[in-house]
Amino acid sequence: MYYAHIRWDDRGAAIASQTVAEHLSGTAALSRAFAEAFGAGDDGELIGLLHDLGKCTDGFQNRLLRDGPRVDHATAGAVACSKYYGRFEDAACIAGHHSGLPDFGNVRTDCAGDATLYGRLKKGIAEKYLESCGESGMTLPDLPRAAAQPDRLCASFRTRMLYSCLVDADFLDTEHFMDGDRGRGGYDDIPTLLARLEKYIAPWQNPQNELNRLRCDILNTCLEAGAKAKGLYTLTVPTGGGKTVASLAFALRHAAVHGMQRVIYVIPYTSIIEQNAAVFRDILGAANVLEHHCGVQLDLSDGAPPEEVCRALAAENWDIPVVVTTAVQLFESLYANRSSRCRKLHNLANSVIVFDEAQMLPLPHLRPCVAAMASLTAQFRSTVVLCTATQPSLGDLLAAYAPGWPVEELCPQTAALYERFRRVTFRREDALEDSALAGRLGEHRQVLCIVNSRRAAQRIYELLPREGSFHLSTLMIPAQRQAFLHKIRERLRRGEVCRVVSTSLIEAGVDVDFPLVYREMAGLDSILQAAESKGRCAG
């Protein structure tokens, strides 16, 4: 009998055991279910069944039962996968299920025992590993040898997705044996969340003025568009048009119609994430929304409240109906090789992914970002929505990476809406010294100044009167920034003195409304985004 895990009591006595066959079967079932979301269930099951084949050795059993030296238990399954099934990418998933996806290396020059995948595969495999599976009552699937994937970028994304399925399944099956029920799941399903949203917006359906009528039209257009086919979409809504709730309406309806797993919002700034996540929690219930970025504290300690533990567990694999995260978190995971980063990836498949403030995608990395979006749609059955008031021109790039997937606008009356939502006039000023600019700002009771650097923002702020003046930058911790934004909104609402100097963090979707905005010269998209802070709530 070969064991995969032993549970010990505080005195070091074994109190429960899980055989290799039990662990492989449990992992394979989960991995298959995860991979079914993008049509790779057979591969998901195969890598689950083979991943811990190397535990069927005296060396590993000595390690497990008598704290012997470490042994490589991942390579055996990788060799079996490559040798008997010809599935090289699947073998990579198995080889790296603890240490991370390995560098493939060079088939001609790598030697047996090298750390590359080719080097590890050349170590060979003893037939007794497979014999041990048979002795344990396990049956390996009868699958044909895999054909090579001609597109290497597509192959890399598929490999990471399958790797994610295996890593998450392995963690979950092991966790279930070692710790029992830790409180994962228990979320409301997508149809329930859609019904909750529809109830929330029902009072809005009798607008009392022209602007609210337009907002209702946008909302209802997005809700109806949710029945459209999966694909690539843009949502171009002018400032003040209510795109946060409108995009959520599309996403939930679309997910409900197509049986999709979740809605994921990708947002450039944590200040906007905090704002939008608060809206989503208010509508859908806090237990159904995960806010995941570097500023969120996650607590898995024994004394943590159950809701905090549930949130921390959801952050490990994004197994929750609504995720609000950063572009950095998403794209770094899509191009990562570490198990902790990749674990969540399979939950991007068959999901609605909304890129809010899409104009903020980083220009130096635009091609890999767009390639990932295209792959999520074309390979992994997801729908991608680019949502902003200032839509970037990504059509050619998307067409190159996802041929045959046209990009469709969800709100086709965009041009007319911009005219009807026009609430801002622009005027170019001559260059001003810091002191002169501070003097101009001091002449107004309520004014916002946006500059291009943190250093400039600090200099100008220090020249303003202390009473009613605020300075915002990305160096602030989230709690401090949110406290300042709350004070700013309250002072604006009460008509009190409120002068704010900020970097560009405030111009992309932060919900504030100033009568006057100064914007240091920048790209046209930044200037238009700055205009969002004036006239946002007009009407």
Report the location of each language-model feature.
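Walker A/P-loop
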Residues: 229-251
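Conserved RecA-like helicase motor core of SF1/SF2 enzymes
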Residues: 65-75, 469-482, 487-489, 497-539
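Accessory nucleic-acid engagement/destabilization modules that flank
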Residues: 1-199
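Conserved strand-helix element at the start of the C-terminal RecA-like helicase core
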Residues: 262-273, 440-465
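Interdomain hinge/linker at the junction between the two RecA-like core domains of SF2 helicases
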Residues: 389-442
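Conserved helicase motor
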Residues: 6-10, 291-303, 452-455, 469-486, ...
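Inter-Walker segment of RecA-like/P-loop motor cores
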Residues: 285-335
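Conserved Walker A/P-loop ATP-binding site and its immediately adjacent core
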Residues: 260-283, 293-296, 393
